[in-house]
Amino acid sequence: MHPVGHVDIAGVRYELPDGRVLLDDVSFRVGEGAKVALVGANGAGKTTLLRIITGDLVPHAGAITRSGGLGVMRQMVTHGIEGATIHDLLLSVAPQRVRDAAAHVDACELAMMENDDEKTQMRYAVALSEWADAGGYDIEVTWDVCTMAALGISYDRSKYRELTTLSGGEQKRLVLEFLLRGPDEVLLLDEPDNFLDVPGKTWLEERINESA
């Protein structure tokens, strides 16, 4: 039986720091296989609601329940990873278990640069095993498909390329390529067509229509 994903928002209320009510008694459910667009004027609270669903913000009332893995594309995909590489961008939208395993591998590699004794080597071997168990090698295969589709370059050749060398559309296309191919059952995409050109918007529409 394949995992299912859903999001249930019940009676959510959110107040701004000055006391103004931004969201009040917001309720809806997104069931398995549904594709839903959240439409509203600038400042209506769309991004705030998405941040409540992800757990970044806590509502003043109401509840959020969800099931399945959650993949998130924020409005600014490079926020928090400025000066980073294509590898860092793809890793930032990977499942938490993969991110944790990658951090452990990086820490062990740094430790080996300082002290290459048997104990450190054993820790590195364990970290690589955890990376494999987390699906790290499999996800690198997916990343290769994504970089080829978005940039026409293999992951091995592009992973250390700085994000500043990519356009905003290329950055978004990379993230979308991964999330739409990735393992998560629930995707939250905040203004996904921003920076995409007309062919990119057409591609996104087709991919969303094709997705389960």
Question: Predicted segment positions?
Answer:
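ABC ATP-binding cassette signature C-motif
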Residues: 1-212
